[in-house]
């Protein structure tokens, strides 16, 4: 591959950021074709039928969905490996990536970040206080309880830095934009993990 890959998306999106961090650690050159979240023209609709970012365009393929993109990049550029080599760990990493993309996306993006940042500042809409209250009192603590049972006290999830670390950590960047920080007294492993991973290059 001689030309940089193109990523259509916004830095605000944790799914875009996941792919950009992945590209950075793979040392794959890329360029951003920026798009405002939730908007897009007819061309974008053709590239992404579900109108979601990121979209990757390279010399072989156009792909949507951050997980599909990262797995494609891993297959095409296997070194340095960002998915564990052990098949059980690799499957577990994919599960954590799926948990992050779905459950954490729902809680940290739709119920927290969108309510605090996107709705008032992009759409000019009021924050739904009922949704936000439930997120802060029930949904987010539930996610953090689960992460606390899965994350290591030191280092990364599977020893070496991997997609699992990236996929989880990107949501805490958006959470910070919304004024949320993990309570280190209640969830010490998660708080330490987030600080370690977000300190890595590319975030």
Model region roles, listed by residue range:
Residues 1-134:
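GST-like domain detector, emphasizing the conserved glutathione-binding G-site
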Residues 3, 100-199:
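GST-like fold's C-terminal all-alpha helical module
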């Amino acid at each position: 591959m001689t030309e940089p890959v193109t990523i259509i998306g916004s830095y605000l999106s944790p799914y875009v950021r996941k792919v950009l961090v992945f590209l950075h650690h793979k040392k794959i050159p890329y360029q951003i074709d920026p798009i405002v979240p939730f908007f897009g023209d007819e061309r974008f609709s053709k590239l992404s039928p579900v109108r979601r970012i990121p979209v990757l365009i390279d010399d072989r393929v156009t792909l949507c969905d951050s997980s599909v993109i990262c797995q494609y990049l891993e297959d095409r550029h296997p070194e340095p490996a960002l998915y564990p080599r052990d098949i059980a760990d690799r499957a577990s990493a994919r599960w954590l990536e799926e948990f992050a993309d779905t459950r954490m996306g729902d809680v940290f993006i739709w119920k927290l970040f969108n309510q605090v940042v996107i709705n008032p500042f992009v759409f000019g809409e009021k924050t739904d206080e009922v949704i936000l209250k439930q997120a802060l009192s029930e949904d987010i603590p539930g996610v953090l309880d689960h992460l606390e049972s899965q994350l290591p006290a030191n280092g990364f999830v599977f020893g070496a830095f991997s997609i699992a670390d990236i996929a989880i950590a990107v949501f805490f960047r958006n959470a910070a934009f919304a004024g949320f920080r993990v309570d280190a007294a209640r969830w010490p492993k998660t708080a330490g993990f987030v600080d370690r991973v977000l300190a890595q290059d590319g975030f």
